[in-house]
UniProtKB/Swiss-Prot annotation:
Keywords: Ribonucleoprotein, Ribosomal protein
InterPro entries: Ribosomal_bS16, Ribosomal_bS16_dom_sf
Ribonucleoprotein found in the keyword field: yes
Biological process per Gene Ontology, one example term: translation
Family: Belongs to the bacterial ribosomal protein bS16 family.
Protein name in UniProt: Small ribosomal subunit protein bS16
GO cellular component terms, semicolon-separated: cytoplasm; small ribosomal subunit
Signal peptide start-end: none
GO molecular function: structural constituent of ribosome
NCBIfam families: S16
Length: 81
């Protein structure tokens, strides 16, 4: 099954997440099919906090990809889909 979820990056105490499309059996930060955005929870006012590619999200959801709870919150916040 294909899922859309967050993959953690960044450094200690400075998380940065990529919104990725991946197989549900792969590891959190392992192989992925496509990167469709990012989420920076510690962004300041000069930096972008969330960016999502709505076209690609809609494509993968139409193909049957399941969206994780955390990504669903980001989508709702951005009103991307």
């Amino acid at each position: 099954m294909v899922v859309i979820r967050l993959a953690r990056g960044g450094s200690k105490h400075r998380p940065f997440y990529n919104v990725i499309v991946t197989d549900s059996r792969s590891r959190r930060d392992g192989r992925f099919i496509e990167r469709v955005g990012f989420y920076n929870p510690v962004a300041n006012e000069k930096q972008e906090r969330v960016r999502l590619n709505a076209d690609r999200l809609n494509h993968w959801i139409a193909q049957g990809a399941q969206v994780s709870d955390s990504v669903a919150k980001l989508i709702k916040e951005q009103k991307a889909v």
